[in-house]
Amino acid sequence: MDNTTTTEPPKQPCTRNTLITQQIIPMLYCVVFITGVLLNGISGWIFFYVPSSKSFIIYLKNIVVADFLMGLTFPFKVLSDSGLGPWQLNVFVFRVSAVIFYVNMYVSIAFFGLISFDRYYKIVKPLLVSIVQSVNYSKVLSVLVWVLMLLLAVPNIILTNQSVKDVTNIQCMELKNELGRKWHKASNYVFVSIFWIVFLLLTVFYMAITRKIFKSHLKSRKNSISVKRKSSRNIFSIVLAFVACFAPYHVARIPYTKSQTEGHYSCQAKETLLYTKEFTLLLSAANVCLDPISISSYASRLEKS
């Protein structure tokens, strides 16, 4: 007679590798912050001497502003993730600082799309005169981009209004009410969609630009063509930085969001998605170091031209 009984082993609580989340990632953000502040400071000082006489310049200046504001949120994340700040700082990061980070990241992404559209018109269809190429139109469009991103993001601040249950283990989603969790999920889908739409536009527009430059180069070797090629080479470097920095994060973002808002994910899956999201988000943050290099290079060419 078999008297043995089987019992399921108790579920192990989810644990995080504190070496990764509290030491390595904060340290890397420190490096990105210091480098970004220096490079954006130099870039801003150089670039804002360039008159806002072209749509392209206006869009680049907005990217400089967005990168600078995004960089200002890094110290809060470093102190929060490393456990050096009080629990109130963690709440501030979840409610405010992280939202500001994402607003400025997607503002930058939107302006990358507008830059590609502007370059397409200037290089591929130079004889077409359109209102979209006017400076005033570009300024209005810039304001609309900022307003749209704020309208999508600010509810994440307002709806993150629940009291803290455990100051030793504060979870972002626990601070949101029911509507806040739904808005968080929906707004993330919208933001990710914005990225992939911009990515598609960049691909289409720059393929057309490459074809135009190649055909022009075959027909003529005049200086104007050389100038166009040099200008476009600078833009391609910006696009390369865009893809390298932002694409990995937006591949990882949707699975991570689903793991936050849906209950059927295992502990191991949640942790894997968390680490993937954090490292790819760090890569996106590193864009604040790459943009100033490309932008300053372009500004110096404008001064010489």
Swiss-Prot record:
Glycans are attached at residues 3, 161. Residues 1-29, 77-96, 161-188, 256-278 are extracellular. Its main location: membrane. The chain crosses the membrane at residues 30-50, 56-76, 97-117, 140-160, 189-209, 235-255, 279-299. It is found in: Cell membrane. GO terms for cellular component: plasma membrane. It is a multi-pass membrane protein. Residues 51-55, 118-139, 210-234, 300-305 are cytoplasmic. GO terms for molecular function: G protein-coupled purinergic nucleotide receptor activity. Receptor for UDP-glucose coupled to G-proteins. Belongs to the G-protein coupled receptor 1 family. This is P2Y purinoceptor 14. The lineage of its organism: Eukaryota, Metazoa, Chordata, Craniata, Vertebrata.
